[in-house]
């Protein structure tokens, strides 16, 4: 497809999505299903007007998926409730690390014993398919910074962290595939645990939390000086994302976790500096903070601004990323060439691995059975899985294995968008 054709197609989809926003919100399916259907219709499965080869275009696809993830992770982070409370974050922390690890292990066992993949490839497939997606899960995400829905909070917070917590398993699988001398496994595992797991997480927390809090304080100080300084919130947020991700990556910490923690720290620090009042649950009210800002500005007092413009801007970029990448997904898939193992892997992941991992991970957390069941079902796979797939390709997968993992992964992502996309609205409405 020509450049003009791409502009025309994406422009028409954007117009249609914009005009049909109310219709789609009332329909039983998500916007991602619409984009996927258009991609499949125009792609190699039907009209064959375009084909996007993830193997040949892995570098471009990696960049697009990475940008979409970073924007989505930042948007999720600034919606987290303030102040941070370990008891409230207990469930998502368990989901992001305990349930994530169990999901990787279960998928790896299935791939090893049923699909007969090598151990390294089995772990790699588990790392690719285990993380839930922050980009495509907008219908079950926290809708705004003051949203107190427990299900949405758990799912959003989990998705914000588990893209980073899955990365060590992708590295472990790749390391095992490229390991020539199996006698040195203990040394490699020790290095993996100390650097790729422990330091990656701790470094991300330190870098992201420190940078987010520092930017919030700098912005607040600039706003309280006279004459008052205007701040371009969108550029500040994008700059924070870029700096935090690059610094974390340079020191081998998790860039995805660092960006999420930076957004959380930014919002936490801003609301505390603004003196936002607390509700009966002890959470600060961002809307009340905005009202106070308006009153202060009207009386020329010191403005204690907590800006929402950057969040709005990121959500617009998030929608554009979703449209583009899901459309490309449709162009990557040929329904006639999907591996036969795809349905088995998807069924095992959706019905066995994810629910079981969530149930075990939340044992003793005080989370009710109904809530655990809902969380166990809502785990859409999407852009994060695409990123880790093409990351593995860039790391040098053997061609035959790359083709097999690509077919399985893209097929599972497609089925996840369809199955979870059709079930999310009825189940969310039923849970209210």
Regions found by a protein language model. Give the residues of each.
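Transmembrane helical cores of multi-pass secondary ion antiporters/exchangers
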Residues: 1-432
């Amino acid at each position: 497809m020509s450049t003009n054709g791409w502009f025309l197609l994406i422009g028409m989809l954007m117009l249609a999505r914009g005009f049909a926003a109310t219709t789609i919100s009332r329909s039983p399916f998500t916007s991602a299903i619409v984009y996927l259907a258009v991609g499949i219709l125009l792609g190699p499965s039907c009209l064959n007007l375009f084909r996007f080869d993830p193997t040949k275009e892995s570098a471009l696809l990696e960049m697009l998926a990475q940008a979409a993830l970073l924007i989505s992770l930042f948007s999720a982070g600034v919606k987290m409730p303030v102040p941070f409370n370990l008891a409230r974050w207990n469930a998502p922390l368990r989901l992001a690390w305990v349930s994530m690890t169990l999901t990787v292990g279960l998928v790896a066992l299935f791939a090893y014993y049923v699909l007969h993949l090598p151990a390294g490839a089995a772990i790699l497939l588990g790392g690719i398919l285990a993380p839930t997606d922050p980009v495509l899960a907008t219908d079950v995400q926290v809708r705004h910074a003051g949203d107190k829905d427990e299900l949405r909070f758990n799912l959003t917070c989990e998705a914000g962290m588990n893209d980073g917590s899955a990365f060590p398993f992708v590295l472990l699988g790749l390391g095992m595939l490229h390991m020539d001398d199996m006698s040195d496994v203990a040394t490699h595992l020790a290095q993996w645990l100390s650097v790729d797991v422990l330091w990656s997480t701790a470094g991300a927390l330190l870098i992201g939390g420190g940078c987010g809090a520092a930017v919030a304080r700098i912005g607040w100080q600039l706003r309280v000086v006279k004459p008052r300084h205007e701040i371009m919130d969108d550029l500040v947020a994008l700059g924070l994302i870029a700096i935090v991700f690059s610094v974390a990556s340079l020191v081998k910490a998790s860039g995805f976790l660092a960006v999420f923690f930076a957004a959380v720290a930014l919002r936490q620090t801003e609301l505390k500096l603004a003196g936002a009042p607390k509700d009966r649950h002890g959470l600060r009210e961002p809307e009340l903070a905005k009202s106070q800002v308006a009153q202060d500005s009207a009386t020329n007092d010191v403005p204690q601004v907590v800006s929402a413009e950057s969040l709005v801007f990121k959500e617009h970029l998030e929608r554009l990323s979703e449209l583009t990448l899901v459309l490309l997904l449709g162009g990557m898939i040929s329904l006639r060439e999907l591996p036969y193992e795809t349905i088995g892997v998807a069924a095992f992941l959706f019905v066995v691995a994810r629910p079981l991992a969530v149930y075990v991970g939340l044992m003793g957390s005080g989370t009710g059975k109904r809530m655990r069941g809902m969380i166990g079902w809502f785990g859409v796979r999407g852009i994060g899985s695409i990123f880790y797939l093409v990351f593995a390709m860039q790391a040098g997968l053997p061609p035959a294995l790359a083709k097999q993992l690509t077919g399985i992964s893209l097929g599972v992502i497609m089925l996840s968008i369809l199955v979870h996309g059709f079930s999310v609205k009825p189940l969310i409405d039923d849970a209210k």
